[in-house]
Design a protein with these regions (language model features):
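Extracytoplasmic soluble-region selector
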Residues: 1-102
Length: 102
């Protein structure tokens, strides 16, 4: 298990996770503490040689700590299939614990 992320109210929290949408799976935020707000989500494509497809990139989640709190920031790889989505168990990088202090 990774050490907790400790921040103060008003500070940003940035989590970067490998993501490869070409597989049909996407990294999705599935749980976060109430004192944290999701401010931005972006995707940074990976470096690929000409002609390469399916190269993983990075999904970047930016949060702002709004109030003292603690709890998990949980992400899952989800493939939105029919009739039920396929949800993979989180890796250690996708299962973080955050402590926000005043």
């Amino acid at each position: 298990m990774l050490p907790p992320i400790k921040v103060k109210v008003g500070e940003p929290i940035v989590i970067q996770l490998e993501d490869n949408p070409s597989t049909g799976f996407n990294v999705c935020l599935t749980e976060m503490p109430q004192g944290i707000a999701l401010a931005d989500v972006s995707y940074l494509p990976g470096q690929a040689l000409p002609g390469m497809v399916g190269v993983p990139g990075t999904r970047r989640f930016t949060f702002i700590a709004l109030a003292p709190c603690e709890g998990p920031l949980l992400f899952n790889q989800i493939k939105f299939t029919h009739p039920e989505p396929t949800v993979q168990e989180p890796t250690p990088m996708e299962n973080r614990f955050v402590i926000v202090e005043s």
